[in-house]
Amino acid sequence: MMKYFLVLCLVVLAVAAVQAAGLEEEKFLNLGESLAMPEESRCKARRYGCTDKAECCSEKCAYPALTCVFNWSCEKVCA
């Protein structure tokens, strides 16, 4: 019984580690989810990255908090 408890603890720790690593990944593109959304929702939902300069510079997507690939700000890229 103790063996199962230890395995369960290891699984929980592994899941927590993967989720913590996933927080860093959110800063970059998550194309699987974002491409499934309508364009306007995709722009609003993706606060940390954009697929290309055209999308970053579009009126819908050019929020000050939004950063483009390589962490360029939209203002810097679109200027």
Swiss-Prot record:
Keywords: Disulfide bond, Glycoprotein, Ion channel impairing toxin, Knottin, Secreted, Signal, Toxin. Transmembrane segments: none annotated. It is found in: Secreted. One of its GO terms (cellular component) is extracellular region. Expressed by the venom gland. GO terms for molecular function: ion channel regulator activity; toxin activity. Residues 1-20 form the signal peptide. Disulfide bonds join 43-57, 50-61, 56-78, 68-74. Glycans are attached at residue 71. The keyword Disulfide bond applies. Ion channel inhibitor. The presence of a 'disulfide through disulfide knot' structurally defines this protein as a knottin. Belongs to the neurotoxin 13 (insecticidal toxin ABC) family. ICK-21 subfamily. This is Toxin ICK-21.
